[in-house]
């Protein structure tokens, strides 16, 4: 099912502020309870992460009123004695979950608090496939360097959820939606007729507003004005500038389906502090959650994918992660092609440890070189301060690797980029020692400037 179709809903109407944060424990509990109820009804073990992912996806589909979801359907689960599990097709009746979602989620009284949470939950859970399959859908469609895909996070979630958390979605996603809007004006899904100009203008202004709130450079905002008018000559220059003049992306710490299903206590749950680290450590200490993959060689990397998914660290410096979590972090290129889901099997236990922690970065933190395919710039997820690295001296080389070029804004943005590149530190606050708020400085001796997709 496609999840990146054009959003034609227009800018959402202004509503009274809904305090989602205080409802996090309750929403986590409700998702977990629905997962456990559905699994127990069909005798599906939730101590296997593959099974949790399937069950969790079904609950998510019910919560978002997915049109492709059938009341009764067949799904594949790992079933059988420990150590001898086999993929088994099971018929699942989800009518009770559909009824629950209708009253608890879809009701207008609750929808406003649920959708921002569901958006973050979907971003977190879709990260695993993004890492394993390593595709570049947004940058390829925009015809810019694949190195910039780190600023297309969240592209795979439903548009109605993107609207609930627009600042948690990468700016290139908004840029792609704007380009599609101009090239293929949307139609009303009911009448099949093109939308009236006021509706299209409303959608365009909403997208442009999201972009301008995320991008902090004055020249970047000037280029966005050009895009709004349908002039895309400066696209590659704008995209390259994101690596130096880094945008605001609101990061949150969100548990994945296997962690939710295996968490016993959500008291005090938040999306932004040490509770998330502690919750993962408790699940790890139980030694009951089993991880799936191609074979045992993948176990450490599959456990690291949990970290990348929960903390949204796919663009973070691996040196920072090694210091925070106390162990070597792997690059995706160290492993071969991932197996088909039908060939996945239990390969080990979920393990998690940490030595330091930091809150998620929700503001702008503060590199560019040739036509490299891998990641060449850190997109910080943690607020803690750390050294800032530039793997480039100008934006010339990266811009030449993209499909479209311009000189209109080039000199302006180059000068502005240099000011940011000269900064030696990025991040806005400090790291903390495990178990409290004792401030700790990131060590300058740590091995940094390596990336998951490098």
From Swiss-Prot:
Its main localization is virion
The job of this chain, per UniProt, is described as: Encapsidates the negative strand viral RNA, protecting it from nucleases. The encapsidated genomic RNA is termed the ribonucleoprotein (RNP) and serves as template for transcription and replication.
Protein name in UniProt: Nucleoprotein
- Gene Ontology BP, a term: symbiont entry into host cell
Origin organism lineage = Viruses, Riboviria, Orthornavirae, Negarnaviricota, Polyploviricotina
* Gene Ontology MF terms in the entry: RNA binding
Similarity field = Belongs to the influenza viruses nucleoprotein family.
| Compartments reported by the entry | Virion
SUPFAM superfamilies, sorted: flu NP-like (SSF161003)
The keyword Protease is assigned to this record = no
Organism of origin is Thogoto virus (isolate SiAr 126) (Tho)
Q: Where is this region: Disordered?
A: 1-22
One cellular-component annotation, GO: helical viral capsid
Write the record's keywords in alphabetical order, separated by commas.
Capsid protein, Helical capsid protein, Ribonucleoprotein, RNA-binding, Viral nucleoprotein, Viral penetration into host nucleus, Virion, Virus entry into host cell
| RNA-binding is among the record's keywords | yes
């Amino acid at each position: 099912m496609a999840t990146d179709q054009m959003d034609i809903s227009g800018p959402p109407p202004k509503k009274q502020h809904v305090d989602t944060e205080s409802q996090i424990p309750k929403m986590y509990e409700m998702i977990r309870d629905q997962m456990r109820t559905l699994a127990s009804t069909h005798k599906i073990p939730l101590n296997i992460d593959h099974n949790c992912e399937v069950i969790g996806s079904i609950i998510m589909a019910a919560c978002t009123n997915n049109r492709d979801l059938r009341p009764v359907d067949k799904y594949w689960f790992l079933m059988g004695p420990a150590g001898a599990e086999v993929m088994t097709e099971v018929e699942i009746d989800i009518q009770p979950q559909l009824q629950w979602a209708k009253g608890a989620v879809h009701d207008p009284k609750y929808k406003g608090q649920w959708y921002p949470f569901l958006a973050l939950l979907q971003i977190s859970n879709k990260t695993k496939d993004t890492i394993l399959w390593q595709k570049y859908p947004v940058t390829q469609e925009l015809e810019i360097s694949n190195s910039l895909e780190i600023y297309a996070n969240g592209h795979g979630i439903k548009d109605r959820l993107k609207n609930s958390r627009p600042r948690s979605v990468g700016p290139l996603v908004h840029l792609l939606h704007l380009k599609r809007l101009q090239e293929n004006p949307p139609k009303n899904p009911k009448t099949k007729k093109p939308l009236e100009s006021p509706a299209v203008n409303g959608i365009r202004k909403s997208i442009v507003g999201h972009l301008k709130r995320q991008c902090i450079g004055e020249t970047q905002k000037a280029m966005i004005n050009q895009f709004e008018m349908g002039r895309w000559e400066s696209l590659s220059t704008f995209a390259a500038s994101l690596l130096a003049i880094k945008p605001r992306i609101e990061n949150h710490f969100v548990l994945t389906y296997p962690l939710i299903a295996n968490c016993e206590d959500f008291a005090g749950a938040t999306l932004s502090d040490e509770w998330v680290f502690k919750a993962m450590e408790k699940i790890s200490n139980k030694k009951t959650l089993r991880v799936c993959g191609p074979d045992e060689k993948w176990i450490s990397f599959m456990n690291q994918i949990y970290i990348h998914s929960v903390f949204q660290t796919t663009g973070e410096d691996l040196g920072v992660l090694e210091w925070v979590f106390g162990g070597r972090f792997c690059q995706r290129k160290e492993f071969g092609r991932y197996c088909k889901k039908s060939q996945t099997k239990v390969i080990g236990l979920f393990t998690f440890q940490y030595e330091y922690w930091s809150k998620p970065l929700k503001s702008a933190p503060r590199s560019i070189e040739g036509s490299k395919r891998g990641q060449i710039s850190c997109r910080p997820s943690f607020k803690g301060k750390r050294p800032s690295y530039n793997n480039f001296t100008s934006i010339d080389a990266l811009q030449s690797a993209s499909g479209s070029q311009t000189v209109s804004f080039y000199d302006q943005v180059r000068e502005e980029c240099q000011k940011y590149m000269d900064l030696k530190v990025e991040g806005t606050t400090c790291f903390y020692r495990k178990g409290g708020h004792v401030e700790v400085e990131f060590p300058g001796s740590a091995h940094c400037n390596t990336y998951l997709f490098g």
